Design a protein with these regions (language model features):
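Signature of Asx- and small-polar-rich beta-strand/turn repeats characteristic
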Residues: 1-170
Length: 170
C-alpha cells in the first residue's frame, strides 16, 4: 500500500538582515508552517510547511534560502513510550492520523522521555543490509488508513529497550 502524497512546491527567497541591530552569521528557517495562501481556492486556503530546520549563512547582510521544498499541510507529532512490561513486539506504535504522507516521517528515539539526546531512525523497506545495530523502522498500513511503525527485533534492526521514548513528526 502507498500513502497519500502531500502537494509540494520549491521556493526561493532571501532575507535582508542589514537593518538588524545584531548582525547574524546564520539564519534558520524553523520546521513548520512557512506560507499560507493569501486567497482562497474554492472554499479552502492552503498552508505549506518545511519538513526540517534549514540554516543558511548570511553573506553581506543577505540570507538566501534557495530551492526550499515546502509541503502542503501541517506537521504533526506523535510520541510513544516503550512498555516496561513488554518492550518487544507485539507493542504497537500506530499513528492516529489517517491519510498521512509517510515520506515525510521523521523518527527519533531517546533513551527515556527525560533524555535530551536522541538517535535518528530511518525508514527501511527491505531487510538487505539491515543488521542488529541498524537504527531502522518499517511501516505497515493498518485499519482506517492509518500506519503502524515497526522497529527491529535485535536481529533485523536495533531492538527498542524498555522506557525508550519515540518522537515521530510527519
Amino acid at each position: 500500500p502507498r500513502s497519500r502524497t502531500a502537494s509540494k512546491a520549491i521556493i526561493s527567497f532571501f532575507v535582508d538582515t542589514t537593518g538588524f541591530t545584531t548582525k547574524p552569521v546564520t539564519l534558520t528557517l524553523k520546521k513548520g508552517i512557512v506560507a499560507t495562501s493569501a486567497a482562497t481556492f474554492g472554499s479552502e486556503s492552503y498552508s505549506f510547511c518545511v519538513p526540517s530546520d534549514i540554516t543558511v549563512p548570511v553573506v553581506d547582510g543577505i540570507a538566501t534560502f534557495g530551492d526550499v521544498t515546502i509541503c502542503e499541510g501541517a506537521f504533526l507529532t506523535s510520541n510513544f513510550v516503550v512498555s516496561a512490561e513488554n518492550p518487544a513486539p507485539p507493542s504497537r506504535y500506530i499513528l492516529q492520523n489517517p491519510n498521512i504522507d509517510t515520506s515525510t516521517l521523521e523518527v527519533q528515539v531517546r533513551e527515556t522521555q527525560a533524555s535530551t539526546s536522541s538517535k535518528k531512525y530511518v525508514f527501511s523497506d527491505t531487510l538487505i543490509e539491515v543488521d542488529s545495530s541498524s537504527c531502522v523502522y518499517f511501516i505497515q498500513e493498518v485499519e482506517d488508513q492509518r500506519y503502524e511503525l515497526i522497529f527491529g527485533d535485535g536481529v533485523f534492526g536495533k531492538k527498542l529497550e524498555s522506557l525508550n521514548y519515540i518522537d515521530v513528526s510527519y
